């Protein structure tokens, strides 16, 4: 069965690209036609590309690989958080802090600070500190949680990035390139597909389109990790039978 159907893509508006004056000629191979000054993406190609990306993410996750979901534009923020959490992966949905990948040690220090503040709140330290100090510490904790909450359990660099709108997330793309981390991305008609390892040609501005495609990448992880659990159970059962 296909990973995604033309009907699903059409209903979510994945085929609507940008205005014809705002385009990247390299996306020509993924464009079906032009209608009322807007490029229409070739959904037959999108179906194939979603499948390629899905298979890549599934295999990566099955091998224990970790994916970082990145989407900081308003239309992507909720989907990125919800879908990454659903499949147990990491996410950044507010602002990409420069050096998140290339200066990972410094980011880790800020994450350690966040965890320390959370522990202080949990163990009652805040209750014995002066009120003014607690207000400042809570503000600091909220700010760190806002920007780093989605990666606070990421103890090493991710094995792949899933990005919504590579133009908007160009710093993340550049950092991933520098570290040879593969990139899967929703690529609209105004983006450069050559920067992306697994291109998903599609509308990166409509909430429904973003939700659908992000959900499919999360599904790939869920399929891989739940399958791994079943396999482990089967192995355990076989071991029990042979040792009995």
Swiss-Prot record:
Keyword Ribonucleoprotein: yes
Protein name: Small ribosomal subunit protein uS2
Molecular functions per Gene Ontology: structural constituent of ribosome
A Pfam family per the record: Ribosomal_S2
CC annotations in GO: cytosolic small ribosomal subunit
Source organism (scientific name): Halalkalibacterium halodurans (strain ATCC BAA-125 / DSM 18197 / FERM 7344 / JCM 9153 / C-125)
Keywords noted in UniProt: Ribonucleoprotein, Ribosomal protein
One GO-annotated biological process of the protein: translation
Name of the gene encoding the protein in the UniProt record: rpsB
Keyword Ligase: no
UniProt record similarity statement: Belongs to the universal ribosomal protein uS2 family.
Gene3D superfamilies: Glucose-6-phosphate isomerase like protein, domain 1, Helix hairpin bin
InterPro entries in the cross-refs: Ribosomal_uS2 (IPR001865), Ribosomal_uS2_bac/mit/plastid (IPR005706), Ribosomal_uS2_CS (IPR018130), Ribosomal_uS2_flav_dom_sf (IPR023591)
